[in-house]
A protein has these predicted regions:
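Extracytoplasmic
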Residues: 15-35, 39-45
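Residue-level signature of mid-helix packing/kink "hotspots" within the transmembrane helices
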Residues: 28, 56-64, 148-149
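Conserved MFS/SLC helix-loop-helix module at the cytosolic interface between two early adjacent transmembrane helices
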Residues: 61-97
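Paired small-residue
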Residues: 89, 100-108
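Cytoplasmic helix-loop-helix junction between adjacent transmembrane helices
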Residues: 105-144
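Helix-loop-helix hairpin linking two adjacent transmembrane segments in secondary transporters
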Residues: 140-188
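Flexible cytoplasmic inter-helical loops of multi-pass small-molecule transporters
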Residues: 183-207
C-alpha cells in the first residue's frame, strides 16, 4: 500500500541520514580541540592542520575507489564498514599519546569517510520511491549539515565536563551505536550487487564527491 511505501521511504531516509550525519559530525570533532591538543602534544597549529589535510586528502582520493567497491560488494556492506572504521578511528584519537598516532588515525578516518556519498546515495536511489527521491536527497544533505553543526558543541561541552580524550571516545561510541542501529533496522537495505545503470550512477556520485573534497 502507499502507507507501507511511505513508512519504508522515511525509514530508509532516517537510517541513511543518521549515517551521513555521523560522518559529517566526525569531520569536526578535532578542530574545536586544537587549542587543547596544541598544548597536550606540544605541536604547532600548522602540524594540527595537517590532521585535517590528511583526513580530507585520503577521503577525496578514495571516493572513486569506494564507488567501485559499492558496485562490487553492495552499498550496505561498504557503508557499515566505512562508518565502523571512521567511528573506531575517532575512538583511537581519544587513546592517542603521541602526535603520530593522531596522524595515523586521521588517515584511517579519512579512508572510512570516503565511502559515504557513493554508498548512501546508492541506497537512496535503490530503496526510495522515485517520486520521493528529491526529498530523500534533501534529508541527506540536511543530516550532513546537522552533523557539522552539532559536533563542535558536543566535543567542547564533553571536554569541559570530562576531558578531551573522553569527548572523542564518546563521539566514536555514538558512531558505533548508529552502526548497531543500522544493522538491526536496515537489514533489508540490500547487500546485492547493483546493476549497470546504478553502477554508472555510483561512479558519478564518487567523482562528484571527489570534486567536492578537492
Amino acid at each position: 500500500s502507499s502507507n507501507q511505501y511511505l513508512r519504508s521511504d522515511f525509514r530508509v531516509m532516517g537510517l541513511v541520514g543518521a549515517a551521513h550525519g555521523a560522518s559529517h559530525f566526525f569531520h569536526l570533532v578535532l578542530p574545536p580541540l586544537f587549542p587543547i591538543l596544541k598544548e597536550e602534544f606540544d605541536v604547532s597549529y600548522s602540524a594540527l592542520a595537517l590532521l585535517t589535510t590528511c583526513f580530507y586528502g585520503v577521503s577525496g582520493i578514495a571516493q572513486t575507489l569506494a564507488g567501485f567497491l559499492v558496485d562490487r560488494f553492495g552499498a550496505r556492506n561498504i557503508l557499515l564498514g566505512g562508518l565502523t572504521l571512521l567511528a573506531a578511528s575517532v575512538i583511537g584519537y581519544g587513546f592517542a599519546t603521541e602526535f603520530w598516532m593522531l596522524l595515523l588515525f586521521s588517515l584511517l578516518a579519512g579512508l572510512g569517510n570516503s565511502v559515504f556519498h557513493p554508498a548512501d546515495l546508492t541506497i537512496l536511489t535503490q530503496k526510495v520511491t522515485p517520486l520521493r527521491l528529491g526529498k530523500a536527497y534533501g534529508v541527506h544533505a540536511f543530516s550532513g549539515n546537522l552533523g557539522w553543526a552539532t559536533a563542535p558543541i558536543f566535543v567542547i561541552y564533553a571536554s569541559q565536563l570530562f576531558n578531551w580524550q573522553t569527548a572523542l571516545i564518546l563521539s566514536g561510541l555514538l558512531g558505533l551505536f548508529i552502526v548497531l542501529f543500522f544493522v538491526i533496522f536496515g537489514s533489508d537495505l540490500t547487500d546485492t550487487k547493483v546493476g549497470s545503470k546504478i553502477r554508472i550512477d555510483t561512479t558519478v556520485f564518487s567523482l562528484a564527491s571527489l570534486n567536492q573534497n578537492l
